Amino acid sequence: MPEPLTPATPAELAEAVRSHPRVLAVGARTKPRLSQVPGDVALLSTRALRGIVEYEPEEFTFTALAGTPVREIAQALAEKGQYLPFDPLWLESGATLGGTVCAGTSGPGRFRFGGVRDFILGVRFVDGLGRLLRMGGKVVKNCAGFDLPKFLVGSLGRYGALAEVTFKVFPAPAARLTLKLKASGAEAAARVLTEAAASRWECEALDFLPDGRSVGLRLAGPATALEAVSREILARWPGQVLSPGEAQTIWTELREMRWAHAGGALVKVAITPNVIAALCTAVESLDSTRLHISAGGNVGFVSLSTGIPPAALQERLRGLGLPAVTLCGNAPLWCGARATPAIAGAVKQALDPQGRFPSTED
């Protein structure tokens, strides 16, 4: 496959789209399955399209070019005591802002404050006609094309090429505390997740860990309050408070997907807490398969070893009626049940009437 083109400005990105009959914008390709497209599709790398365009700490918003590594943004925010609460995945691996938006990937922190979709405010993007358009805005209270930026989250770049993105951010918490709670299995873990999610503890992150026998519960806020809440939680379930170093190791491994098999398929599954046990049973029959349940039981990540045929997982997910998308590896892009809403076709026709960007079937 030819090397991707590397436009360095939004105008160059628009020109590159107009110059090719079929295109797809890609970032750092930390989720490589999403950029596996037919050979006639020209890849447009956004790696040269990087930098923070505007950052207003007092307004809690920033605007950055799509190819900007999320790590650079996180560092700039940290200097002002702010952060992106949704725990962007593959942060240390070089994931870009545009790739994070198009993949719709969020980490454990999504549980309390929401995912990528809840923080995006506006975009500049190139549509299928090569027009550089702006939707949304640069302030929180804005209704200019408000829904379209959110619609682009998880779109896999099939509606246009992102050039610039505006996000809102939050003040960083004063302190964090992580508990590792014992769970004898999937059903027990599901009960812990459900009860903790409905509690008054305001958990920042709530995950069934890949070890299959424990729940990671992260709290954020004033240190004295966290200590009191942790005692209450440990009176309800057996477990322990982790040291800061132990906690950082766990959450970093989850965020960077280091728990997953290297080289195997990694599949993101949309779930609800009531199907956790069924999903665990389904994947346990696949040798060496690993599972991580995140966001309080609302998303699952399944990692297959290289020797397991993806069709086996696909069959089980379809049997459970669970939609899934493959992020890494050679499994089908849509690796589960799938129902495409009618609005998706209407938006595709409006933004890309010539089919310049790949269809969602590619």
Language-model segments: residues:
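Short, conserved charged micro-motifs
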Residues: 71-73, 186-191, 224-231, 275-281, ...
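FAD-binding subdomain of flavoenzyme oxidoreductases
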Residues: 86, 93-206
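Short cationic amphipathic helices and targeting signals
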Residues: 3-6, 62-64, 177-182, 212-225, ...
